[in-house]
Amino acid sequence: MIQPQTLLNVADNSGARKLMCIRVIGAAGNQRYARIGDVIIAVIKDAVPQMPLERSEVIRAVIVRTRKEFKGDDGIIIRYDDNAAVIIDQKGNPKGTRVFGAVAEELRELNYTKIVSLAPEVL
């Protein structure tokens, strides 16, 4: 569960390393916590030098991994080692060209097929 002030890792090669959630938009409107597949507004806390994204820039991101366990559609409980997000644009397309680490299969059902196709592993 991601809420405002939560620090997240960035799971793509867009240039940012760490994000801090400042607002949860969610998939279904105004929510208190973000889960896998929800959209958040975040600020970049750490970035790679000489990249398009810089520190203190406000961006949109979709949650791809959470430490809080969740039950999949088939009943399996999945829990990841970190909280991670992929930076997206206004249309929902990822800004990076690679995605690092595993992502949840629920992203495919939420029409984030580009993120799923870039990921090396889908759980």
From Swiss-Prot:
GO terms for molecular function: large ribosomal subunit rRNA binding; structural constituent of ribosome. It comes from the Eukaryota. It holds the Pfam family Ribosomal_L14. PROSITE patterns: RIBOSOMAL_L14. Its main location: plastid. Coiled coil: none annotated. SMART domains: Ribosomal_L14. InterPro entries: Ribosomal_uL14 (IPR000218), Ribosomal_uL14_bac-type (IPR005745), Ribosomal_uL14_CS (IPR019972), Ribosomal_uL14_sf (IPR036853). Keywords: Chloroplast, Plastid, Ribonucleoprotein, Ribosomal protein, RNA-binding, rRNA-binding. Part of the 50S ribosomal subunit. This is Large ribosomal subunit protein uL14c.
